[in-house]
Every structure is written in C-alpha cells, then in structure tokens.
C-alpha cells in the first residue's frame, strides 16, 4: 500500500518557530485580568501604569509591583505640582522628557520593553519609554497620542492644534528638528538637535494599545525560544485587555494568539505528538472559542494526524481521532479524511479477496460513498484496473486470449477512458492471432493445407479483425490453390 503524503503548513509571521528539546504543556489562562481596567475605553495615568506593570510580568499588588508603582507616583507628583502647572503646555511636554532622563532612563536596549526593568535599572526601549512619557503627560493634563510604525513607537502631543512628535528614546527628542539649548560653562551656548524624522506607515493608536505593546514584544521574543508557557498567557491577557478597541485591533490581537497556538501545534507535530496537539486545540476552543484561523489549524492538524496513523497501519486509531475531533474542523476536511479512512479500510479488506470479489467490493463503493478528491478517485480507478488486469492475466496465462479479450472488453465498458485496458485488449487479440499462426505452422510444413485453412477460418470467426490471421489465410489460399 502506498504511503499518504502529509500536507505541510507554516505560519508566515514575524513570530516564528525555533528549536526545542523539551516542551511543557502551556496553560490557556491569562497572565492577569482586571475587569475594572479591561472594561474601560480609556484609562487613567495610574491605571495605564498598573497595566504596564502587569504586562511586564510583575504582579502589581506584589512588593516588587508596589515599589515600581511608587517610583512612578514620585514622578507623577512632580509633573502635577504647582510648579509644573505654572508653565506652558509646550514647556511641560518638553520638561517631562527631561525629567525622565534625569531620574529614570539611562541606557537604550532595543529589546528591553518591560516598564518594571526600566524603573529598576534604567534600561529602556521605544515602547517602555513611550508608556512612561504618555502616563506622565496624561497626568498633567496634556493631550498625548501614541504613534506606531511597523518597527517603532513614540508619542505626539497636541498643543494649540499643533501636533508635536516626541521621540522618547532620546533626551532631546521633543519636537525633532528643533534646537535644544544645553547647560554650558563660560557663558558659551551649546545646542543639541535631533533630525526631524519622516516616519513611514505611522499610525495613531490608543493609549491602552501602546501599553499592550509591552506584551506583544515579550511574547514575540518568547516565541523565538518556543517558550509557549509564557507567550500564551501574555497574548491571552492582551487580547482580553483590548476588547474595547476597534474590531481591527481586536482581530489582530486574537490573530496573534491563534498564531501562537498554531506554532505550538507545529512543534508537537514535529515530534509526532498529534494526539497532544489535537487535545490542546480542543482546549483552546473550549477556553477562548474558535476562529477561521484556529479552525484551519485544527483541520490541518487532524488531517496530518490521520495521515500519520494510516501510514503506520493504525486504522482504528485514525477512526477514533476522527470521531473525537471531526466537529471542530472544516467540512471539506471532514470529507477528505472520511474518504481517506474509507479507502484504507477498503484496501485492507481487498488484501484477502480474489480479483472477482475485489471488483464487486469496488463497484459497491460507488453505492456507499461519493468520492470528491481527485487522488481518491484515481486510487479507486487504479485498484479497479489492477484487479481487472489480474483477471485478464489469469486467462492469458492459460493462453485463453479470446476470453482474456472479452474480460478486457467488459472492463473497458466500465472504464471507457482507460487506455491501458484498451492496449491490453488489443495485445490479447494479437496474441490470439500469433497463437493461431503458430498452430498452423506444422500443418503447412506437412502440406496439410485444408486443416490449416480450417483452423484459420475458425480463428477468424473468434477474432475477425486479426491482421495476423487474415494475412496467413490469404497467403495460404493462394499457395494451396
């Protein structure tokens, strides 16, 4: 029996599959859930920081979380002071960035997205620094709008209808393109200037969404190490947290979660752990519901699981898996798998049958199932051809070529487009003509022409289109008369 080939599928995304030696079954539970935060369209500055601490994988109510929150409160106290309030909005917006670098930020590290780590050792990236700037600007009454590009995040403040960008990864990043006077000695003025940047594909996002990018960066990094135990709870919390956002944002967050689910199943499949993979997907659906992408993953996983079982002659296992999981896959995959199992069962049944019995079984399949997959139709036709040829060969081996040709003719009536059967029928008739020729040779050599002609005429009745017999008969009649 031929092996069935796997459908191979990959996830095209920035979140990709890495190597792994051991794999823990991840929990499908969120890292955290605060209903009072998740249900709001807009959060206060302190609620944004609380969410940022949680997304940084620190319990905000723990001693560590409380310490981080208090460090933030100390900064918020400064920006909400009367001294700050007495300045213009533009001055406040600029001074917030200066304050961040004087008190907290010290070293840029591209992948350091955690707010907690930023407060602990001063390392930061565009997301963590933008979250801090946004919260402080919001606390002192500024209108601050996060900005996102495919690879960067920053903030903008709106002051008197003017949109001012703030590149939070640089202490002089307020309003890029303008000069910032530096402290200097000897009455010499010095300036710093950050070139104005024309950001490609920039998009305004919500304040809640900016905070959630902490989680997105983290689970992206975890996926590179196949750390699904950490990636899934983060992605699930992010999805729940963004439920008040637009449909597009919500769908993107759910899609990220489904990508993680899919990558995990691929890892399991690479280890031939199909049943674990299917049970995991069932758990995913029970916990967070299904989507078209997750159903597609489920369908492909079950298909590959059935292929694996059938290639290992485990028809019973394949039927059990199909029975358990078929309701969670697309209908077209249900049809594919059902046909595949049916054919394997049929193939096994055919192993202990005669050719005649096999053809009866194959004919009966048309009354029991309508095949939709071309490869399955071709496989059934190949089996029919095989057993018809076996019947033909049985007669040919006994040199019953006319009977063999009749069997071939019967087969052709059932499979009219089968060129191989037509070729075999013609060969049977040709072999019959050759047999008749060989039969008359000794008669002709002994000059028993009448008997030879009689044999040829009888042969021509059975095989009226035989060129061999006609040629022999014409030559012999000329010679004999």
Please report, for each region that a protein language model flagged, where it lies by residue.
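Secondary-structure boundary elements
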Residues: 49-117
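Amphipathic alpha-helical repeat scaffolds of TPR domains
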Residues: 205-224, 251-267, 295-308, 335-347, ...
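His-Asp-centered catalytic microenvironments across diverse enzyme cores
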Residues: 163-271, 275-287
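TPR alpha-solenoid repeat register
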Residues: 248-249, 253, 294, 334, ...
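Hydrophobic/aromatic-rich core segments of domains that either
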Residues: 128-190
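Short coil turns that delineate tetratricopeptide repeat
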Residues: 243-244, 289, 330, 370, ...
């Amino acid at each position: 029996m031929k092996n069935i080939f796997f459908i191979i599928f990959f996830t095209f995304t920035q979140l990709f599959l890495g190597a792994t030696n051991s794999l823990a079954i991840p929990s499908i539970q969120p890292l955290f859930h605060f209903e009072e935060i998740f249900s709001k369209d807009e959060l206060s500055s302190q609620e944004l920081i609380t969410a940022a601490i949680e997304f940084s994988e620190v319990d905000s109510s723990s001693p560590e979380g409380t310490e981080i929150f208090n460090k933030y409160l100390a900064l918020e106290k400064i920006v909400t002071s009367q001294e700050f309030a007495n300045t213009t909005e533009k001055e406040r917006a600029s001074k917030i960035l200066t304050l961040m670098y004087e008190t907290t930020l010290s070293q840029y590290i591209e992948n350091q997205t955690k707010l907690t780590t930023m407060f602990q050792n001063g390392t930061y990236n565009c997301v963590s620094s933008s979250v801090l700037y946004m919260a402080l600007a919001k606390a002192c009454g500024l209108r601050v709008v996060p900005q996102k590009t495919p690879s960067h995040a920053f903030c903008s403040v709106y002051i008197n209808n003017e949109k001012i960008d703030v590149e939070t990864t640089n202490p002089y990043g307020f309003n890029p393109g303008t000069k910032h006077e530096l402290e200097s000695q000897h009455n010499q003025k010095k300036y710093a200037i950050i070139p104005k940047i024309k950001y490609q594909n920039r998009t305004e996002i919500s304040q809640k969404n900016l905070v959630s990018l902490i989680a997105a960066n983290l689970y992206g990094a975890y996926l590179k190490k196949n750390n699904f135990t950490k990636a899934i709870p983060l992605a699930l919390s992010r999805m729940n947290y963004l439920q008040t956002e637009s449909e597009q944002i919500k769908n993107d967050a759910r899609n990220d979660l489904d990508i993680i689910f899919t990558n995990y199943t691929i890892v399991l499949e690479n280890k031939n752990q199909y049943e674990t993979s299917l049970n995991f997907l069932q758990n995913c659906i029970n916990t967070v519901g299904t989507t078209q992408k997750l159903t597609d993953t489920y369908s492909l996983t079950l298909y590959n699981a059935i292929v694996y079982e059938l290639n290992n002659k485990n028809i019973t296992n394949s039927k059990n898996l199909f029975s358990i999981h078929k309701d969670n896959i697309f209908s077209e995959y249900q049809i594919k798998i059902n046909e595949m199992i049916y054919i394997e069962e049929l193939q096994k049944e055919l192993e202990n049958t005669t050719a005649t019995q096999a053809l009866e079984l194959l004919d009966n399949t048309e009354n029991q199932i309508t095949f939709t997959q071309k490869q399955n139709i071709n496989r059934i036709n190949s089996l029919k051809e095989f057993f018809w040829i076996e019947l033909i060969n049985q007669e040919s081996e006994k040199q019953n070529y006319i009977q063999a040709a009749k069997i071939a003719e019967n087969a052709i009536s059932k499979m009219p487009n089968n060129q191989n059967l037509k070729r075999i029928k013609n060969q049977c008739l040709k072999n019959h003509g050759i047999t008749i020729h060989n039969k008359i040779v000794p008669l002709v050599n002994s000059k028993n022409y009448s008997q030879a002609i009689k044999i040829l005429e009888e042969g021509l009745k059975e095989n009226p289109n035989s060129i061999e017999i006609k040629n022999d008969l014409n030559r012999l009649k000329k010679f004999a008369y």
